[in-house]
Regions:
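Hydrophobic alpha-helical membrane-association signature
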Residues: 30-34, 84-87, 231
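Short C-terminal tail/terminal secondary-structure segment
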Residues: 220, 256-265
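Glycine- (often His-adjacent) and acidic-residue-rich active-site loop
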Residues: 54-91, 110
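Terminal peptide-recognition signature
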Residues: 15, 19, 34, 52, ...
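Crotonase-fold acyl-CoA enzyme core
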Residues: 93-209, 237-241, 245-249, 255, ...
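Conserved CoA-thioester-binding segment of acyl-CoA-metabolizing enzymes
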Residues: 1-55, 93
Length: 265
């Protein structure tokens, strides 16, 4: 199977790409099952957080060169790329706006749309052996996968600009120093560490998780006054949930809160 899913305690779903899917993630044979798998965990009310990882040498290498070659020969490359991005981009948008926490355990090289998938997540734990590359310029393409929006917010506009225009390949250490990944973990504990983060971040309420993700993304492209109004609207809404009742009750009783509500996205 191109992809497998394991549900763990604490509401953590682990989605693992097979070695073949990791090296050719966005070929239809691999990407469609991957999309179906993520759709399933996103709609699972018992799932609070999702860990995505690959197998073998790659986390996700993005587009399949054989698919591109065939499409060029058949004179339908434009529609093929349109079809691929029509699937990928809504997925990335859902990851950014979902109430679920997404953590990527970057076990190997991430390139093209596969790098976009990692950058769209909330947290990235990276193997010291992994490498990050855009790959687009070497193919004569402009970037996709949300990278021109995501990467500048993590590393700054000029670092991102050099990454693309120099067609740089970052080591895991470089990616950590720039801020493109959050921490490095030995391959023997990489998945364990990613699950730990996913479980820890996923324990908070739906309103806290989803609202904060939305607010942080909005904060870089809006005025302060607008952001204050956005914060107010979300806080008023979240104050009327059972989770807020639990938060106040647990505070007064001096115990840890236990949030459990679920909202449709």
């Amino acid at each position: 199977m191109p992809v497998s899913t394991d549900m763990l305690d604490g509401g953590v779903a682990v989605v693992t790409l097979s070695p073949a899917a990791s090296s050719n993630t966005f070929s239809p044979d691999h990407f469609d099952p991957f999309l179906s798998c993520l759709q399933e965990v996103m709609e699972n009310p018992s799932c609070r957080s999702v860990v995505i990882t690959g197998s073998g040498r790659f986390f996700s290498s993005g587009g399949n060169m054989d698919d591109f070659s065939d499409a060029i020969e058949n004179d339908n490359i434009g529609s093929r790329v349109q079809e691929m991005t029509d699937k990928l981009h809504p997925l990335l948008l859902r990851i950014r706006t979902s109430e679920k926490i997404f953590v990527c355990a970057v076990n190997g090289s991430a390139a093209g749309g596969g790098l976009g998938l990692a950058l769209a997540s909330d947290y990235r734990v990276c193997s010291p052996e992994a490498k990050l590359a855009s790959a687009f310029f070497r193919l004569g393409l402009s970037p996709d996968g949300g990278m021109t929006w995501l990467l500048p917010r993590l590393v700054g506009n000029q670092v991102a600009r050099k990454f693309f225009f120099n067609s740089e390949v970052w080591s895991a250490k470089q990616a950590l120093d720039y801020g493109a990944v959050d921490e490095l973990a030995d391959p023997s504990v990489l998945l364990e560490r990613a699950i730990e983060v996913a479980r820890d971040w996923g324990r908070w309420s739906v309103s806290s998780r989803k609202g904060t993700k939305q607010l942080l993304d909005a904060s870089t492209s809006t005025f302060f006054e607008t952001q204050l109004h956005f914060e107010q609207s979300l806080m008023v809404a979240s104050s009327q949930t059972e989770d807020f009742v639990e938060g106040v009750t647990s505070f007064k009783r001096k115990r840890e809160p236990s949030f459990g509500s679920f909202e449709e996205e």
